[in-house]
C-alpha cells in the first residue's frame, strides 16, 4: 500500500470536490447560504468514520485508509457544525482514489 495522504490533505481534497459539485447537488438557496456565510461560519472538519458508510458504498470501510469529512456551517452559539451540507467519505490512498458524498436534502 502506498503512503496515505495526511488528514489535512484529505480535508483539502474533500473541500475542493465539494465546491466543484455543490451547485449540481444542493438546492440553490443552500449554495447561496453556504457561500454567503462560509467566511464567518463555514467549516470542513474531520470526524470519526460513521458505521453507516458500508450501506452507502457497498463495502466495508477501512477506517485507516479512509476519512470522513463534514462540510457545513457552525452554530455560533455552541461552536458545533450542525448545518451539514455534505458528508464525504474519501480515500487517503493516492493509488485508490475514491470519494462518496451524502448531500443535504430538505
Curated annotation (Swiss-Prot):
Instruction: Please name the NCBIfam families in this protein's record.
Output: PRK05094.1
Q: What does this protein do?
A: May act as a double-stranded DNA (dsDNA) mimic. Probably regulates the activity of a dsDNA-binding protein.
Report which residue ranges the record marks as coiled coil: none
Q: Which family does it belong to?
A: Belongs to the putative dsDNA mimic protein family.
Record protein name field: Putative double-stranded DNA mimic protein VV1228
List the Pfam families hit by this protein, alphabetically. DUF440
Please give the InterPro entries that the UniProt record associates with this protein.
dsDNA_mimic_put, Put_dsDNA_mimic_sf
**Gene3D superfamilies attached here?**
dsDNA mimic, putative (3.10.450.140)
Amino acid at each position: 500500500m502506498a503512503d496515505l495522504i495526511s488528514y489535512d490533505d484529505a480535508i483539502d481534497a474533500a473541500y475542493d470536490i465539494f465546491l466543484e459539485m455543490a451547485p449540481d447537488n444542493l438546492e440553490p438557496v443552500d449554495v447561496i447560504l453556504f457561500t454567503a456565510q462560509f467566511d464567518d461560519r463555514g467549516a470542513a472538519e474531520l470526524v470519526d468514520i460513521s458505521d453507516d458508510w458500508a450501506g452507502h458504498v457497498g463495502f466495508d470501510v477501512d477506517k485507516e485508509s479512509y476519512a470522513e469529512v463534514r462540510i457545513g456551517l457552525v452554530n455560533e452559539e455552541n461552536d458545533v457544525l450542525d448545518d451539514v451540507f455534505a458528508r464525504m467519505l474519501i480515500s487517503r490512498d493516492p493509488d485508490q482514489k475514491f470519494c462518496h458524498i451524502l448531500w443535504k436534502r430538505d
